[in-house]
């Protein structure tokens, strides 16, 4: 806003108003610049809670039974401003919980329900989430009542779980413990499209081959949770849709049986809404008028609620009794022939060719009126795809099997992004350990830590071997879904022991030394691996003239191969590691951007990333012993040399093929080689500011101290028992 515009707008008395508008940002001017913002989100400045507040402690004081009673009572307390279908909000609440959890994708662990992110853009305004703003607003009195003891993230999912129970399903259990965020997530890549529901072609190598969908995406179009219910790119074809369903659910970590159960169970209750014209709907919540107070898709042209509401555009229920858990979905699917029709909103849907009136569901407002049921193209895929059909027929013949399979799959869906069972809170946490929870047995704490460290120090392992092995064990941790990490020592099991990024030959050499030490000492291998890294760092710090004890908390357990889902762990395989200066192959995304993504998943800040990279380089931990970025002649000493030499203007940096040479500015002699990951710490203005701190003459001890703190954070990232 220019001064002239301010005057013409009524002499705005402050100039800072322009800064609240969408102006030209640094990323607009320099779109290829490294965007470090993803490392600095969800900090204390955006969190309104007191500094000492712990949601995980607060939720333990909740009257869980009372909350469930209130949520169940809400199901049949229809409100005139958004009336419940058939007097029961169950279908709406299930869809809300489903779409919150269903945004999860296994490739990077992002999405999902564990942060309450459905409250914020873009998810709150996705076309597929239309009218879920009403569901959350219906829940507000309960959230208001229980306050800080009940997060939105927990409440959203709990509402779906209780909805199923209120309609007759015996659920598998429920765990509280999801913590709210307070602004939109900046790290999640939802796709490159610039318009909602753009054709699928933009995110596939070939739409005919769903496996070519761009990673880490799982939904077929921008703004959808799963697949297009009308068919691939809105064109009905159940077999083509089946292929997309299979790929999409696989990318969420679901197999074919779970996929069929979830599809059937999700469509046993509730209905779709398309009895009207979509063009009568107002903007989504983010684009709505201020007077709408955060609600979107408001219809001010027609009645727009109840039987006249429009959401997906498809219109109708799937079963005869949409507020009751039963086997009606498969009775309907296999009990009729189906034909393509258009809904009142113009959406493709399948309707029965012939059906008895008593088999039709009643109208949502008038039980004397019967309405034709519908199936989406995804539902027809359960019938037409040979593999899905076989599973569907088995469920049709055995309703108890469907109930059991669905209850477990639903539990998996709504807890998949919560990490190990140790993070679940509440009286309904199932006792059974499930393999997708990455179970780890309890560790031991009663051994002599100093004696173990002494054995490690005398083992003959090098500093680089000890530090690199501990790092590789811990670096798999993802704060997105709390998977991975050093606890369990799965680095010694398939598939991790064979990952190229873990240097299998070097790994086996180190394990052959550390495993006997663990056995002799009564410690877990997981603990000994981390301790070995700590020993290496302490030795390297001492060589730099700094005496330091790296913090250590015993108690990690050792997982077994039987506890490990090898296929499920495949998504955690590192294909790059900027901290060890390695990429598996050339990628479209730059190495420094890959490092940034890994850093965010590990929960590190830009400053922590900087100090760790500088320290790892001088410790000689590069993958394969590569010399790139090792700007020191004292490898194995935890010195500032990486930063000192990177920022030294007596040096000049020149491209040399895929890498760079650091040459003496006067003699042109090659002193070191480097990668883009190394040089970005001198090139990016923010990272250079951090690098200069660690290059200063007065910061040797600070460098060591900060490195140790960041290292300990990585080693303990999955120690949920300590938090």
From Swiss-Prot:
Residues 267-286 are annotated as: Disordered. Binds 1 heme b (iron(II)-protoporphyrin IX) group per dimer. It catalyses: H2O2 + AH2 = A + 2 H2O; 2 H2O2 = O2 + 2 H2O. The active site is at residue 99. The record marks 95 as: Transition state stabilizer. The keyword Transmembrane does not apply. Gene3D superfamilies: 1.10.520.10, Peroxidase, domain 2. Its cofactor is heme b. CDD domains: catalase_peroxidase_1, catalase_peroxidase_2. The keyword Oxidoreductase applies. It comes from the Bacteria. Formation of the three residue Trp-Tyr-Met cross-link is important for the catalase, but not the peroxidase activity of the enzyme. GO terms for cellular component: cytosol. Homodimer or homotetramer. Belongs to the peroxidase family. Peroxidase/catalase subfamily. Bifunctional enzyme with both catalase and broad-spectrum peroxidase activity. This is Catalase-peroxidase. It comes from Thioalkalivibrio sulfidiphilus (strain HL-EbGR7). The lineage of its organism: Bacteria, Pseudomonadati, Pseudomonadota, Gammaproteobacteria, Chromatiales. The gene is katG.
């Amino acid at each position: 806003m220019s001064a002239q515009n301010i005057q013409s707008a009524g002499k705005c008395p402050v100039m800072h108003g322009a800064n609240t508008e969408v102006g030209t940002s640094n990323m607009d001017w320099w779109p290829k610049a490294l965007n470090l913002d993803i490392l600095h989100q969800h900090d204390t400045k955006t969190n309104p809670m007191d500094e000492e507040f712990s949601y995980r402690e607060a939720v333990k004081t909740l009257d869980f039974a009372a909350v469930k009673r209130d949520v169940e009572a809400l199901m049949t307390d229809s409100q005139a401003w958004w009336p419940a279908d058939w007097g029961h909000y169950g279908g709406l609440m299930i869809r809300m919980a489903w779409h919150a959890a269903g945004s999860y994708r296994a490739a990077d662990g992002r999405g999902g329900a564990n942060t309450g992110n459905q409250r914020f853009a873009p998810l709150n305004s996705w076309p597929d989430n239309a009218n879920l703003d009403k569901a959350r607003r219906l829940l507000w009195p309960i959230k208001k009542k229980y306050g800080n003891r009940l997060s939105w993230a927990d409440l959203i999912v709990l509402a779906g779980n209780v909805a199923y129970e209120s309609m007759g399903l015996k659920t598998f259990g429920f765990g509280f413990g999801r913590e709210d965020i307070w602004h939109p997530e900046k790290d999640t890549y939802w796709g490159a499209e610039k318009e909602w529901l753009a054709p699928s072609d933009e995110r596939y190598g070939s739409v005919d081959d769903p496996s070519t969908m761009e990673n880490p995406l799982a939904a077929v179009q921008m703004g959808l949770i799963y697949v297009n219910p009308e068919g691939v790119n809105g064109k009905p074809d159940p077999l083509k849709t089946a292929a997309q369903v299979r790929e999409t659910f696989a990318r969420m970590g679901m197999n074919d049986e779970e996929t069929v159960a979830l599809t059937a169970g999700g469509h046993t209750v509730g209905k779709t809404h398309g009895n009207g014209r979509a063009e009568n709907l107002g903007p989504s919540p983010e684009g709505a008028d201020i007077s709408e107070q955060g609600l979107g898709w408001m219809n001010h042209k027609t009645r727009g609620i109840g039987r006249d509401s429009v959401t997906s555009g498809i219109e109708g229920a799937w079963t005869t009794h949409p507020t009751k858990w039963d086997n009606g979905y498969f009775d309907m699917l296999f009990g009729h022939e189906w034909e393509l029709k258009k809904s009142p909103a113009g959406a493709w849907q399948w309707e029965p060719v012939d059906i008895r009136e008593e088999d039709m569901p009643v109208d949502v407002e008038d039980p004397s009126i019967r309405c034709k049921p519908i199936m989406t193209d995804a539902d027809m895929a359960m019938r037409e795809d040979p593999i899905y059909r076989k599973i569907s027929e088995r469920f049709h013949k055995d309703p108890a099997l469907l109930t059991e399979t669905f209850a477990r799959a639903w539990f998996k869906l709504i807890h998949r992004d919560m990490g190990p069972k140790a993070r679940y809170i509440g009286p309904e946490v199932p006792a059974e350990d499930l393999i997708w929870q990455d179970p780890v047995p309890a560790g031991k704490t009663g051994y002599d830590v100093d004696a173990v460290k002494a054995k490690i120090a005398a083992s003959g392992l090098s500093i680089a071997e000890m530090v690199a092995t501990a790092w590789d064990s811990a670096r798999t941790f993802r704060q997105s879904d709390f998977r991975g990490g050093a606890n369990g020592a799965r680095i010694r099991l398939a598939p991790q022991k064979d990952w190229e990024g873990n240097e299998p030959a070097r790994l086996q050499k180190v394990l052959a030394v550390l495993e006997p030490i663990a056995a002799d000492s009564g410690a877990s291998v997981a603990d000994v691996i981390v301790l070995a890294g700590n020993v290496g760092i302490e030795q390297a710090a001492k060589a730099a003239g700094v005496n330091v004890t790296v913090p250590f908390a015993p108690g990690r357990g050792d997982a077994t191969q039987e506890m490990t889902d090898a296929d499920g762990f495949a998504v955690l395989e590192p294909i790059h590691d900027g901290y060890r200066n390695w990429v598996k192959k050339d990628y479209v995304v730059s190495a420094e951007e890959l490092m940034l993504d890994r850093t965010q998943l590990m929960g590190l800040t830009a400053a922590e990333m900087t100090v760790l990279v500088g320290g790892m380089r001088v410790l000689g931990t590069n993958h394969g012993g590569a010399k790139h970025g090792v700007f020191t002649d004292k490898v194995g000493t935890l010195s500032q040399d990486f930063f000192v030499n990177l920022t030294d203007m007596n040096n000049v940096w020149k491209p040399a093929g895929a890498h760079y040479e650091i040459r003496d500015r006067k003699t042109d002699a090659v002193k070191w080689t480097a990668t883009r990951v190394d040089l970005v710490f001198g090139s990016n203005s923010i990272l250079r500011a951090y690098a200069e701190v660690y290059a200063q003459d007065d910061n040797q001890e600070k460098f060591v101290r900060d490195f140790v703190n960041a290292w300990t954070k990585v080693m303990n990232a999955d120690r949920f028992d300590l938090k």
